[in-house]
């Protein structure tokens, strides 16, 4: 017996049968061992018996019984599974005869299945006879599966019914109602139909950005085929979606992948144009299965594509088409391009309306129309790195899932009460152990409290469960309507007019009426009482998801946020002292943006802050970040002195291709891409190379910039603040009593215009002049710095108070109009914080003590009280 004459699957089956015999301590490998392996591991054997309508469970039980009857041999020196039984040897001989009769090159699994039918006394054959299955019936099933193919390779079993194994029948999925409806895209579907109707090169390739609905167009074509809404040439055709992944997966030996693909193509060819092959991500066939000297899938397709023997629909993205298919001109010319543009917001809304019912049935929720409109418009405005309708569909899906999870999980109010009950029960158990009168009194009070909480918990639980049941009932009725509509479609397609009439005029209206009654009852209950569960998906839920994805607040303003925004200017005044105009302009820009009336095509605001050092330019940006986001982490600070050389400018948007750091992206663009709602602070802009401002022109005007990777970065939700010391000499010399005269402002602007190009300055919203700080401002800043010191010492539980004399002395001593507030910090560190630190370290100031700082003979005194 030559093992090379057997297919790989038969060889593997015998090896596994031997392992089974060894594990079972059987001396010989028997037919039962082989069939145990075939029925558990061979998909082909199961498929044969399935087509022959054999009860596989009964057959498996027979095999199990036969195995238990084989004697177990134990003892030393016994070799298990080293010999074949007489019956198995005969089975192999008979299998070889079957192979010759069927004119095959190798002995494969089907020959074993046929050969066992010749062993009349074998329990397997007896069981099949009992099921009234003859050898002829089994042979017919095998020939049906083989589809006229011969066993010409050692991988033969892999290649039977290749389309079923490596593809999905989209038309069958439409018939069984598994695919979502396809709305719109009529022009593209008509274009595909036109190309498919050609004599040669009838192979459309759908090209478009990820998420625009390329696969949906093919699904739409499948739905039209089912509805017979296609030209005569396409009626009754089948669309098979080929899964390249499963075609490649498990191809261990050279040539195995090509063999599988050849089997697929052969089946398509044999269908005489009845099968349209859809290859999603068609660029994967270029180079697929290629090893040294081997032919790749793309080259195998070319001859059939050119001759029109293969109707193929491809789908790929623009980038991948350019990268893979355009390089192979011979493959490209065999396809006809169909460009799939991104749908408009209006088209997306109609797509969402078409899918609304499917989402409602799946999630068991109620979707408002304003939620669909919000999903399309908000995703278009805020999620800029993805494409419609995919991103809008994802938004609706996630919003529905959020509501569904809330329905299924315990409401927070009930959860709180349940936890309180548990806590009181633990306390009750502890108090029962105590025997003193006080504990007994406390136990009585606690038991009354516990009874109240338990009653409340039970009421809430029953209310929650009844609401949940109502929602589930509505969901079930919706599913029933969907199922009946699918049945109606099937009946109409099969011209079963009696069934169609019964469904259309009888069953469907009755169930729809039931649904309307349930929904009306539900609405009535909602109006009368407070509901625990929410089943409505509104625009607020969509806005919350957008905020969660992007970090941009797009939900409607809640009361607390309104107050926060209206008080933004006051909050900033407390942190940035003496710069009222600057604070007002910046807070107004944020107010306009949050109210939703800013220009949607530009950043929230762009400002140039001009003024001497230490007057609060950077401090205002920090204060704004803290007030808007409760942390300074949302401030993207870029020191423009790092961009003084021409070659360093590219670091903002990323190194060009071929340079080190190309993959990392730009310092500015990457920061904004990850955090689209932030404050961008460009510090000391006059120190940057002039080319930097050419990059910023697009950002300031259109709120967008393209990075080195070709990605569009959205700056529409950023506040751009640029600081500069230009004109600070004039501001210091000519500011009178803390006011800037119009002449001074004009002179500073002239200096600014000589430094920067007019097209740059013209795009900035406001140029704000910061006044040099007066002595009164400095006193206010002293108060602020002392408060900060008090907060730092509060951690050590030390309180400090500074007398007014000491504060006034600090302000006068540290005041320097040229350097602003920075010397003030240094002065407090040197003359207040350092002596204070020395006292703390020496142990003179202990925790829980208070320190009074006063002035005596121009020296600070520290009086400690416990």
From Swiss-Prot:
Residues 343-551 are annotated as: Linker. Residues 84-148 are annotated as: Repeat 2. Keywords: ATP-binding, Chaperone, Coiled coil, Cytoplasm, Nucleotide-binding, Repeat, Stress response. Residues 161-342 are annotated as: NBD1. The keyword Chaperone applies. GO terms for molecular function: ATP binding; ATP hydrolysis activity. Residues 561-772 are annotated as: NBD2. Residues 6-70 are annotated as: Repeat 1. ATP 1 binds at residues 208-215. It is found in: Cytoplasm. One of its GO terms (biological process) is protein refolding. Residues 3-148 form the Clp R domain. CDD domains: AAA, RecA-like_ClpB_Hsp104-like. Gene3D superfamilies: 1.10.8.60, Clp, N-terminal domain (1.10.1780.10), P-loop containing nucleotide triphosphate hydrolases (3.40.50.300). SUPFAM superfamilies: Double Clp-N motif, P-loop containing nucleoside triphosphate hydrolases. Homohexamer. The oligomerization is ATP-dependent. Part of a stress-induced multi-chaperone system, it is involved in the recovery of the cell from heat-induced damage, in cooperation with DnaK, DnaJ and GrpE. Acts before DnaK, in the processing of protein aggregates. Protein binding stimulates the ATPase activity; ATP hydrolysis unfolds the denatured protein aggregates, which probably helps expose new hydrophobic binding sites on the surface of ClpB-bound aggregates, contributing to the solubilization and refolding of denatured protein aggregates by DnaK. The Clp repeat (R) domain probably functions as a substrate-discriminating domain, recruiting aggregated proteins to the ClpB hexamer and/or stabilizing bound proteins. The NBD2 domain is responsible for oligomerization, whereas the NBD1 domain stabilizes the hexamer probably in an ATP-dependent manner. The movement of the coiled-coil domain is essential for ClpB ability to rescue proteins from an aggregated state, probably by pulling apart large aggregated proteins, which are bound between the coiled-coils motifs of adjacent ClpB subunits in the functional hexamer. This is Chaperone protein ClpB. It comes from Listeria monocytogenes serotype 4b (strain F2365).
């Amino acid at each position: 017996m030559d093992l090379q004459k057997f297919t790989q699957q038969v060889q593997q089956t015998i090896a596994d049968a031997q392992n089974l015999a060894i594990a079972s301590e059987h001396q010989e490998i028997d037919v039962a061992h082989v069939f145990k392996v075939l029925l558990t591991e061979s998909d082909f054997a199961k498929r044969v018996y399935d087509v022959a309508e054999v009860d596989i469970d009964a057959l498996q039980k027979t095999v199990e019984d036969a195995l238990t009857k084989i004697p177990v041999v134990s003892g030393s020196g016994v070799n298990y599974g080293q010999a074949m039984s007489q019956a198995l040897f005969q089975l192999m001989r008979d299998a070889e005869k079957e192979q010759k009769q069927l004119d095959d090159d190798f002995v494969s699994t089907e020959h074993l299945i046929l050969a066992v039918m010749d062993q009349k006394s074998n329990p397997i054959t007896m069981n099949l006879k009992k099921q009234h299955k003859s050898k002829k019936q089994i042979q017919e099933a095998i020939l049906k599966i083989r589809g006229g193919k011969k066993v010409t390779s050692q991988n033969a079993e892999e290649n039977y019914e290749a389309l079923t194994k490596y593809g999905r029948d989209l038309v069958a999925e439409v018939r069984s109602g598994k695919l979502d409806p396809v709305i719109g895209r009529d022009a593209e579907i008509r274009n595909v139909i036109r190309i498919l109707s050609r004599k040669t090169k009838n192979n459309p390739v759908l090209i478009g950005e990820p998420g625009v609905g390329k696969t949906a167009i093919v699904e739409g074509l499948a739905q039209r085929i089912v509805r017979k809404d296609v030209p005569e040439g396409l009626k009754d055709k089948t669309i098979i979606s080929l899964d390249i992944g499963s075609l490649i997966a498990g191809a261990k030996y050279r040539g195995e992948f090509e063999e599988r693909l050849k089997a697929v193509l052969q089946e398509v060819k044999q269908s005489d144009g009845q099968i349209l092959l859809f290859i999603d991500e068609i660029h994967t066939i270029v180079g697929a299965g290629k090893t040294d000297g081997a032919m790749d899938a793309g080259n195998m397709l070319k001859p059939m594509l050119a001759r029109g023997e293969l109707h193929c629909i491809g789908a790929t993205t623009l980038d991948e088409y350019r990268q893979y298919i355009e390089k192979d001109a011979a493959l490209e010319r065999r396809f006809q391009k169909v460009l799939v543009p991104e749908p408009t917001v209006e088209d997306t809304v109609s797509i969402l309306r078409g899918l609304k019912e499917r989402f409602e049935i799946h999630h068991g929720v109620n979707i408002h129309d304003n939620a669909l409109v919000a999903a399309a418009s908000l995703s278009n405005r805020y999620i800029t790195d993805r494409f419609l309708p995919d991103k809008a569909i994802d938004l609706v899906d996630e919003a529905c899932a959020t509501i569904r999870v809330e329905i299924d999980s315990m409401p927070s109010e009930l959860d709180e009460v349940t936890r309180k009950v548990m806590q009181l029960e633990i306390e009750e158990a502890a108090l029962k152990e105590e025997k003193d009168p006080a504990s007994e009194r406390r136990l009585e009070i606690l038991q009354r409290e516990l009874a109240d909480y338990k009653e409340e918990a039970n009421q809430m639980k029953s209310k929650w469960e009844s609401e949940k049941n109502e929602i589930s009932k509505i969901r079930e009725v919706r599913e029933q309507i969907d199922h009946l509509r699918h049945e109606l479609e099937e009946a109409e397609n099969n011209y079963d007019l009696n069934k169609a009439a019964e469904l259309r005029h009888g069953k469907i209206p009755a169930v729809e009426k039931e649904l309307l009654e349930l929904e009306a009852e539900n609405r009535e209950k909602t109006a009368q009482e407070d509901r625990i569960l929410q089943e409505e998906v509104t625009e607020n839920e969509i806005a919350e998801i957008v905020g969660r994805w992007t970090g941009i607040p797009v939900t409607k303003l809640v009361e607390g946020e309104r107050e926060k925004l209206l008080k933004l200017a006051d909050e900033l005044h407390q942190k940035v002292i003496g710069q009222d105009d600057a604070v007002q302009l910046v807070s107004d820009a944020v107010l306009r943006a949050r109210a939703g009336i800013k220009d949607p095509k530009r950043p929230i605001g762009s400002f140039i802050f001009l003024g001497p050092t230490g007057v609060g330019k950077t401090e205002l940006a920090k204060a704004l970040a803290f007030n808007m986001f409760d942390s300074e982490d949302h401030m993207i600070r870029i020191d423009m002195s790092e961009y003084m050389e021409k070659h360093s400018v590219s670091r903002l948007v990323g190194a060009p291709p071929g340079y080190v750091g190309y993959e990392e992206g730009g310092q500015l663009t990457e920061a904004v891409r990850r955090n689209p709602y932030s404050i961008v602070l460009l510090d000391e802009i006059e120190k940057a190379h002039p080319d930097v401002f050419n990059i910023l022109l697009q950002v300031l005007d259109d709120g967008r910039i393209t990075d080195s990777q070709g990605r569009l970065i959205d700056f529409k939700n950023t506040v751009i603040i640029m600081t500069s010391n230009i004109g600070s000499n004039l501001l210091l010399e000519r500011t009178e009593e803390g006011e800037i005269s119009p002449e001074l402002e004009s002179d500073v602007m002239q200096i600014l215009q000589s430094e920067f190009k007019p097209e740059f300055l013209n795009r900035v919203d406001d140029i704000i002049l910061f006044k040099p700080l007066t002595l009164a401002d400095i006193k206010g800043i002293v108060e602020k710095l002392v408060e900060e010191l008090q907060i730092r010492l509060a951690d050590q539980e030390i309180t400090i108070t500074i007398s007014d004399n000491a504060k006034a002395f600090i302000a006068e001593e540290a005041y320097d109009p040229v350097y602003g507030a920075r010397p003030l910090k240094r002065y407090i560190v040197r003359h207040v914080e350092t002596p204070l630190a020395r006292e703390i370290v020496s142990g003179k100031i202990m925790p829980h003590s208070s320190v009074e700082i006063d002035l005596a003979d121009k020296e600070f005194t520290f009086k400690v009280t416990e």
